[in-house]
Curated annotation (Swiss-Prot):
InterPro entries: DNA_helicase_Holl-junc_RuvA_I, Hlx-hairpin-Hlx_DNA-bd_motif, NA-bd_OB-fold, RuvA, RuvA_2-like, RuvA_C, RuvA_C_sf. Residues 1-61 are annotated as: Domain I. It is found in: Cytoplasm. The RuvA-RuvB-RuvC complex processes Holliday junction (HJ) DNA during genetic recombination and DNA repair, while the RuvA-RuvB complex plays an important role in the rescue of blocked DNA replication forks via replication fork reversal (RFR). RuvA specifically binds to HJ cruciform DNA, conferring on it an open structure. The RuvB hexamer acts as an ATP-dependent pump, pulling dsDNA into and through the RuvAB complex. HJ branch migration allows RuvC to scan DNA until it finds its consensus sequence, where it cleaves and resolves the cruciform DNA. Keywords: Cytoplasm, DNA damage, DNA recombination, DNA repair, DNA-binding. The lineage of its organism: Bacteria, Bacillati, Bacillota, Bacilli, Bacillales. NCBIfam families: ruvA (TIGR00084). This is Holliday junction branch migration complex subunit RuvA. Homotetramer. Forms an RuvA(8)-RuvB(12)-Holliday junction (HJ) complex. HJ DNA is sandwiched between 2 RuvA tetramers; dsDNA enters through RuvA and exits via RuvB. An RuvB hexamer assembles on each DNA strand where it exits the tetramer. Each RuvB hexamer is contacted by two RuvA subunits (via domain III) on 2 adjacent RuvB subunits; this complex drives branch migration. In the full resolvosome a probable DNA-RuvA(4)-RuvB(12)-RuvC(2) complex forms which resolves the HJ. One of its GO terms (cellular component) is cytoplasm. Residues 62-140 are annotated as: Domain II. Has three domains with a flexible linker between the domains II and III and assumes an 'L' shape. Domain III is highly mobile and contacts RuvB. It holds the Pfam family HHH_5. Belongs to the RuvA family.
Length: 201
């Protein structure tokens, strides 16, 4: 198995590149060939696809792209050309996010992906990409956690403002604030109700 090819880009076509290494030119199908420039030095991470009638190399600029490509090949109805089209048409992080969020509308935008195939991609890959592209998954979920935290902080701030409007002094509000901070994920109304329960005791 060829893990990667490091060499000089000899030729760029709409479907593939040719990279020269040790006097040998490797034809490699890539998602976006025109990101490469002829005579530039590149490292291409490769996947060797073997069929009875053909031996083909598919190449990617990162190991993460390659890993996502191999995962897509495991989906019923997705072949090398389909997986390559998905990677070529969208950012890998956006593809992963669409899978995790079950966003069929996003996935059907890719060439050759209908509703049935989009649903199959989600069924086969949701929750199974963390070990393949951990950095992308980590960034995705960290982003979601940050949004949740920001939403909770906003709800708490709105609740405190509501208490001020109701006429409660800062001293009283500060007394119940530690109790409110212990509560996670409440809405503004729920925070207000919790505060009033403490204040009216």
């Amino acid at each position: 198995m060829i893990e990667f090819v490091k060499g000089t880009i000899d030729y760029v076509s709409p479907q593939y590149i040719v990279i020269e290494n040790g006097g040998i030119g490797y034809q490699i199908f890539t998602p976006n060939p025109f990101i490469y420039k002829e005579r530039s030095q590149e490292t291409i991470f490769t996947y060797h696809h073997i069929r009875e009638d053909a031996f083909s190399l598919y190449g990617f600029s990162t190991r993460e792209e390659k890993a996502l490509f191999t995962k897509l090949l495991n989906v019923t109805g997705i072949g090398p050309k389909g997986a390559l089209a998905i990677l070529g048409s969208g950012d890998p992080g956006a593809v992963i996010q669409a899978i995790e969020n079950e966003d069929e509308a996003f996935l059907v935008k890719f060439p050759g992906v209908g509703k049935k195939t989009a649903r199959q991609i989600i069924l086969d890959l949701k929750g199974k990409l963390a070990d393949v592209v951990p950095e992308m998954i980590e960034n995705l979920f960290n982003h979601e956690e940050r949004l949740e935290k920001q939403t909770a902080e906003t709800a708490l701030e709105e609740a405190l403002e509501a208490l001020r409007v109701l006429g409660y002094a800062e001293k009283e509000i500060k007394k119940v604030l530690p109790h409110l901070k212990e509560e996670i994920g409440l809405t503004t109304d729920q925070y207000v109700k919790k505060a009033l329960q403490k204040l009216l005791k």
